[in-house]
């Protein structure tokens, strides 16, 4: 079996198994691919090895893959999920004073708090907001409507860093960055804002 059961591209996990031929060699492969790993079975017929997930190819959604391990006469298979790391909110434009959005996050793993770190146009951290807790093997979060700017903002381009750390660091991994520009009022209209990129 594999632990955990869901991975980002090149994520690291643990492959374990039992009931194989003691002291024999094992090989592993993904369905439709060549061999991806080999090793030696211990004297009790057990396998314990590091697993590196393949690269995720696509733009959205999880994929289910099958990993097979064999020592020749015995074959064991297990499935796991491969996911992208995504974060988004909608609507993507509106008056920042009143804009309420629904966040969608995928890929941070199960049972993690999800945090949005608000980096102001001057590059300084303004606020960190916890928006919920992930669930499921791959870490899914869907929020109800919440204020996008629950504090006084300044004009310019903000950066939202989304990650699973309650403390902000520009070096946190994994993380996602989303830009949001707030424009000054003009021609009798109030301030407006919209996601960039």
Which ranges hold each PLM region?
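Extracytoplasmic/secretory-pathway segments with low complexity and glycosylation-like composition
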Residues: 1-197
């Amino acid at each position: 079996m594999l632990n955990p059961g869901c991975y980002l591209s090149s994520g690291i996990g643990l492959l374990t198994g039992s009931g194989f031929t003691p002291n024999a060699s094992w090989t592993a492969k993904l369905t439709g691919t060549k061999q991806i790993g080999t090793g030696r079975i211990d004297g009790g017929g057990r396998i314990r090895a590091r697993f590196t997930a393949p690269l995720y190819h696509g733009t959205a959604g999880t994929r289910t893959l099958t990993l097979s391990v064999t020592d020749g006469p015995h074959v064991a298979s297990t499935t796991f999920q491969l996911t992208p790391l995504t974060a988004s909110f909608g609507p993507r434009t509106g008056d920042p004073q009143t804009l309420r959005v629904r966040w969608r996050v995928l890929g941070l793993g199960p049972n993690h708090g999800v945090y949005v770190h608000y980096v102001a146009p001057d590059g300084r951290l303004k606020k960190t907001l916890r928006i919920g807790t992930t669930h499921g093997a791959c870490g899914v979060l869907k929020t109800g409507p919440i204020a996008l700017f629950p504090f006084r903002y300044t004009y310019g381009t903000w950066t939202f860093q989304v990650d699973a750390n309650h403390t902000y660091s520009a070096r946190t991994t994994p993380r996602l960055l989303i830009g949001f520009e707030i424009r000054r009022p003009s021609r009798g209209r109030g301030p407006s804002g919209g996601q960039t990129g």
